[in-house]
Amino acid sequence: MQKGNIGVTTENIFPIIKKFLYSDHEIFLRELVSNAVDATQKLNTLASISEFKGELGDLTVHVSLGKDTITISDRGIGLTAEEIDKYINQIAFSGANDFLEKYKNDANAIIGHFGLGFYSAFMVSKKVEIITKSYKEGAQAVKWTCDGSPEFTLEEVEKADRGTDIVLYIDDDCKEFLEESRISALLKKYCSFLPVPIAFGKKKEWKDGKQVETAEDNVINDTIPLWTKKPSELSDEDYKKFYRELYPMSDEPLFWIHLNVDYPFHLTGILYFPKVKSNIDLNKNKIQLYCNQVYVTDSVEGIVPDFLTLLHGVLDSPDIPLNVSRSYLQSDSNVKKISTYISKKVSDRLQSIFKNDRAQFEEKWNDLKIFINYGMLTQEDFYDKAQKFALFTDTDGKHYTFEEYQTLIKDNQTDKDKNLIYLYANNKDEQFAYIEAAKNKGYNVLLMDGQLDVAMVSMLEQKLEKSRFTRVDSDVVDNLIVKEDKKSDVLEASKQEALSAAFKSQLPKMEKVEFNVMIQALGENGSPVMITQSEYMRRMKEMANIQAGMSFYGEMPDMFNLVLNSDHKLVKEVLADEEKECSAAIAPIQTELEDVTKRRDALKKKQEGKKDEDIPTAEKDELNDLDKKWDELKQQKDSIFAGYAGKNKVVRQLIDLALLQNNMLKGEALNNFVKRSIELI
């Protein structure tokens, strides 16, 4: 028996391995099974070039549980005593830091032939045994034993067949790995597509009302997964079946892309476009990354462009660099090339479907839209390609490319400054009246109700030349597209003041909501009262919800305009009645107000151009008193108008009708509206 120390100068390398090199203890099984598969594949390679002339026989890798042990057995190339010394014992580095650095620079040489991958066994084991026999003729079987210290023993043993058994004596704090269900789940996670059969126990069947083991191995993996096959060999049903195996709880995918490239990097895989739910983040991390059919991670940021992390599927590449635990990706030029390649393949596939089967593309647009919009917002190259097949959808459900839509609206939706105005709604039901008003003017209205449409609107205004997006409820219909300079309002100032004060006094008090009353001549057939919301302020608040650094806008109140149509019969009647009821009380106040205004204006004119110290104190005091008096008289007038409005049910009824149309009338206010409606009828 040979005894010795593993060739490291640090007292004990294993705590370093546990702490720094592996993020998840569970990957020990992946590493050891992968090593067994590598050893088996090497034997196959040697046999194919006639360097091994014996019988290959059954090459299944077996994983088995004992009372306190896990054993991984293969019938691969095995190891000689010299090879154990080379690959296991002689990790001859000057210290732990150099050890880590050396590994980082030489990962591929070590992983896959025992080496560091093997040492992951000590994360869960108090003792590890290697019982191995080389395929070489006349080779002597040996047994290597180590308890996690730098000391080991190596002795000759009897072993009938070539290959390697690794026996792990599981630590007391890792007993979970002795449970059949735990090992079964890990094998399913990491080893489902390894290229050599992996058996865990025996298949079971129901007999006499209970499950019993059969003599047949329970092989847990598909050795020739779909992505390793040629697309020409596969049917649509094959792709759908594989998707169901990967994601049994998901709806059928929209379509898929089969990747297969050998130069300048190796990459195979299948990416599926899923039906996306409403929450973007819930659907990330669904692409599984493999390295030569060994599962690595489902965190593919950096390999897959960010907008495509919403996709499902598998990618397999030996050219993606991994750290020691194979759980995180390193920055690398190959990765950037792969990311660019995937983005191009996706845009080419979308372009192909659009070109060859536009009806199918339009049918699936609502599901595709989030991927395409996300890509256009985050990747300039993708935007350049996607603008040819990205679609607008109008409120009638018709689809247009960007170019088609520009042609459609150019004649009727260009304003006086030659800007093309894109009208849109984000809720067909709530904005129905506004949509209908726009359509009655001959305008087309887009439906932009997607999760990313707020950001898309802002981006498209920058990308599309002389183009502006305006929501249909941001102004009265005549002001949405201003084609010529407007005439001034027909109502004189005193009448506007009376109407405005009356309606303003009856507006409801709502948390974080402010109203501004406006009066416009909108024609006898226009609505008597409407509520609009400034496009700019609303958009800033919407962007604040999705973009960091704009929380200031999110804290501001919602600003709405209550627009009175001075041409409408009901508004005219309210104004006439108000003048009749209030004129006697208003007249003396108005006379005094005019006198105050006249004197105040005269004083201000007199003080124009003078420095503050040159203005007599008496004049300053008088002007201050006049300002206070003016405010007081104005409040008296507003109070009289408010008193009138409070008794006039039509004023509140018109306001509530506008609120109702805008989905802003609820609870007690809605109940009061219903009662008042009955009384008025």
From Swiss-Prot:
List the molecular function annotations (GO) for this entry: ATP binding; ATP hydrolysis activity; ATP-dependent protein folding chaperone; unfolded protein binding
For the keyword Transmembrane, the answer is no
One GO cellular component term noted in the UniProt record for this chain: cytoplasm
Q: Which residue stretches belong to region B?
A: 327-545
Q: Where is this region: A?
A: 1-326
Protein origin, superkingdom? Bacteria
Please state the protein's primary subcellular location: cytoplasm
- Write out the ranges of the annotated region (Disordered): 601-620
Localization recorded for this chain is: Cytoplasm
> What residue spans carry the region label C?
546-681
Q: Which keywords are on file for this protein?
A: ATP-binding, Chaperone, Cytoplasm, Nucleotide-binding, Stress response
* Role description: Molecular chaperone. Has ATPase activity.
**NCBIfam families per UniProt:** PRK05218.1
Subunit annotation = Homodimer.
The record's comment on protein family reads:
Belongs to the heat shock protein 90 family.
Which protein are we looking at?
Chaperone protein htpG
Its source organism is: Bacteroides fragilis (strain 638R)
> Quick one: which gene encodes this?
htpG
